[in-house]
């Protein structure tokens, strides 16, 4: 009994250390780097989305089952070092946590959706940020990305007991940016400003003169043209010419 009492603190420490080591070793590393889709694919990069190749055949390890969830971790490039895999599904970060944490989980799937084997003719890609209707507080929501990045992603396998395996982080991905129209290079001199002002005034005077000319022409045309009313009548005098008059009868025969 005395021996057991003296060894109990040491035994508890060893068990705690063993549990920590087991948790640290349970996360299997998958030597796969997520890749962007082919450069020939339309919409590969937009202002709020990007497209990945599906990780086909990368989750065939015996420790991974068909019921395990495969998440895509989306992170700011400078937040990958502080990423911590959630221990429970309830602790999964959502897009609403992105500004504070710098990462979230989305596009939940299973390994049955990423089978191995030869590639087929079907287009198999993952479009990140493609769902505009889901709430950013919904677990697994695939909301449009909030800025140009850069972003990095990886796949995380989770079971009911916690995280099981993860892939490598991808390289940095930068989204397209809206082009902003810029003025001509170089400062505008005072002479340029004066010339622009004079041309603007001359254009206004020319338009005013043209408008006045049109109005004057319209009034002049309407005032000089006689317009007969519908009630005016035209009388034509009837007369006979002398050579058309009938000769009178002279005497009886």
UniProtKB/Swiss-Prot annotation:
Subcellular location per UniProt equals: Membrane
Residues in the Extracellular compartment per record? 27-194
What superkingdom does the record give?
Answer: Eukaryota
CDD domains per UniProt:
UP_IIIb (cd09969)
Q: Which family does it belong to?
A: Belongs to the uroplakin-3 family.
Q: Which residues are glycosylated?
A: 78, 130
What InterPro entries has UniProt attached to this entry? Uroplakin-3
- Where does it sit, as one GO cellular component term? membrane
Q: Which residues lie on this side of the membrane: Cytoplasmic?
A: 216-253
Signal sequence extent: 1-26
Predominant location = membrane
Keywords annotated in UniProt = Glycoprotein, Membrane, Signal, Transmembrane, Transmembrane helix
Q: Could you tell me the membrane topology recorded for this protein? A: Single-pass type I membrane protein
Instruction: Indicate the transmembrane segments per the record.
Output: 195-215
Q: Tell me which species this is from.
A: Bos taurus (Bovine)
Q: Report what the protein is called.
A: Uroplakin-3b-like protein 1
